[in-house]
Amino acid sequence: MSRICQVTGKKPMVGNTVSHANNKGKRRFLPNIQEHRFWVQSENRFITLKVSAHGMRIIDKKGIDAVLAQMRARGEKI
């Protein structure tokens, strides 16, 4: 499963884990991706999206129809 948010495009970042002695080692910061089913009233069906917590807030604010329109304008297949 890819760890990319379909709404915001968030993906894993690379950084350092830093010990108390200030030794550094590589690590990945993973986004909070959830697979969530959204009811789309206009299409009368559920749509499953992989979205981050921030992406869910965007959907709450703008509405699922507006977000889907933006995704389709980018050329994403839903």
UniProtKB/Swiss-Prot annotation:
The keyword Transmembrane helix does not apply. GO terms for cellular component: cytosolic large ribosomal subunit. The keyword Acetylation does not apply. The lineage of its organism: Bacteria, Pseudomonadati, Pseudomonadota, Gammaproteobacteria, Cardiobacteriales. Keywords: Ribonucleoprotein, Ribosomal protein. It comes from Dichelobacter nodosus (strain VCS1703A). It comes from the Bacteria. This is Large ribosomal subunit protein bL28. GO terms for molecular function: structural constituent of ribosome. PANTHER family: 39S RIBOSOMAL PROTEIN L28, MITOCHONDRIAL (PTHR13528), LARGE RIBOSOMAL SUBUNIT PROTEIN BL28M (PTHR13528:SF2).
